[in-house]
Amino acid sequence: MNILFVLGTKAQYIKTIPMINHAIANNLNVTVVDLKQHPEKAKLLINKIKGDYVYKEYIKNQYDLGTYLNLISWFLKLLIKILFTRDKNFKNNYSVVHGDTLSTLVGALLIKKNKGRLVLLEAGLGFPGMFKHFPESFVRYYVAKFSDYLITNGDDQINQLDEWNVKGKVIEISRNTIYDSLDLVNLENDNSKNKVVISIHRTENINSKDN
C-alpha cells in the first residue's frame, strides 16, 4: 500500500513525522513530497524519519520563506507547476496534508489535481471567520470541504466539521498529534526542573487574552 505525505513547513514535519514513522514501521510504501516552504528547518527534521521511504522535491528552494513577497512568488510557481504537470504517483493513493498553512492548500490542490485520496490531518480547527485570520481560516474551510478523509480530535472540531457539512469521512483520534511529536525531542521526565513549554504559534492564540 502506498501513502504520500505532502509537506512544506517545519510545523508540518514536526507533527507528521510520528505518523510517517508509524507508516514505515507497518511496511507501507511512504513518499514524502517536499513543497519547500521551510527547507532549512525541514532538513534538520528529516533525519527523524526512521526507515526506508522516498523523498521528492516538488520545487527548488534553498531558503526558508519569511516575507510576503517570497511567499507569493513561491505560491504562484507551485500553482503553475500543478496546473501544467501531472504526477501519476498520487492517483488513487492516500495522500496526507496537515493543518492550515499555504503548504496545506497547495498540497490539497496537487493531490486533487492528480486524483489522489486527500487526507487532512488536524481537521476542524477553530473558525473565527473566513477573513478574520486569513489565510488560515480560508485554508481550514476549503481543504476540509474537498478532503476525502478528515482526521480530528475533540467535540469542538467534530461539530465544526458538521457545520461545514463536509462530505469526506471523519475519523476521530484520541488526542492532538503534538503529543506524539514530543517523542522526537526526547524530553526527560524530570520533575525537578521548573520548566514548561507553551505553544502560541496560532494567530488566534496570540490575539486572545483568554488563550
List where the protein language model places each region.
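Nucleotide donor/acceptor-binding cores
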Residues: 1, 93, 194
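Structural beta-sheet core signal
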Residues: 5, 31-34, 120, 198
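Cofactor-binding loop segments of dinucleotide-utilizing enzymes, especially the Rossmann-like FAD-
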Residues: 8-9, 34-37, 123, 201
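Conserved nucleotide-sugar phosphate-binding/catalytic loop shared by glycosyltransferases and other
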Residues: 28-78, 84
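A nucleotide-sugar donor-handling region in carbohydrate enzymes
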Residues: 39-40, 144-209
